[in-house]
Regions:
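A domain-start/cap signature at the N-terminus of enzymes
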Residues: 69, 73-126
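Serine-hydrolase catalytic machinery in alpha/beta-hydrolase-like enzymes
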Residues: 121, 125-193
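Conserved small/polar residues in nucleotide/adenosyl-binding loops
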Residues: 197-199
């Protein structure tokens, strides 16, 4: 899966969806069908919602089955309560898929922990890349490595939230505890002889 390419396609899909779901659905479906291996859970979720927004109940179930049953992926429970999926809220097949996804989420949430990539100082300055919601440390690193390419005075490290958002992705809840992994990471590098730390 090419996370950068997938994110770019999803951003373009959102822009198209502002003018109409049918066009956005066709655009994303064409991109996916051209190279399915380049896309992950977020794309199948988008396809499900776009299909729902165009009243294609059979397609919604097809995409969710592919994600949850075929690929073994899962989503945060609230995500499958999206208005675009509302046409399935009483469908037994949808409820069964949601139950499987919810159970996988609960299992992941019970064992997930924040991760800080720091091992040792390798450059004068530290750039701490923090991912956004529905992303992960790998995404954050890839986004910032291109910006800092060729700047050897910077060491890029990542902090990943301990709160899962979906299969392979994480989120920050912006509550009284979600900032703690970042604060702990900052504290861990305070005495490492760095000239500058940037988040």
């Amino acid at each position: 899966m090419d996370a950068k390419k997938e994110n770019d396609i999803l951003e373009k899909t959102l822009a198209i969806a502002e003018s109409g779901y049918p066009e956005a659905y066709q655009f994303l479906m064409d991109a996916y069908e051209a190279c399915p291996a380049s896309y992950g859970p977020q794309t199948l979720y988008f396809l499900s919602c776009l299909a729902g927004g165009t009243d294609k109940k059979t397609d919604v179930l097809m995409w969710l089955k592919k994600a949850i049953s075929d690929c073994g992926w899962w989503y945060r429970p609230e995500v499958l309560e999206d208005d675009d999926l509302g046409l399935l809220k009483d469908e037994q097949e949808f409820l069964s898929l949601k139950a499987v996804s919810d159970a996988r989420y609960a299992e992941a949430a019970a064992s997930s922990k924040a991760c800080f990539s720091w091992m040792k100082k390798t450059a004068e300055n530290l750039f701490l890349a923090v991912h956004g919601n529905t992303q992960n440390a790998e995404t954050a690193r890839a986004d910032w490595e291109t910006v800092l390419a060729g700047k050897d005075c910077w060491q890029i490290e990542t902090i990943q939230s301990g709160e899962p958002d979906g299969y392979g992705t994480y989120r920050w809840s912006y509550d009284e505890t979600s900032y703690l992994p970042v604060a702990d990471a900052m504290e861990a590098v305070q005495d490492k002889g760095l000239s500058l730390i940037h988040i």
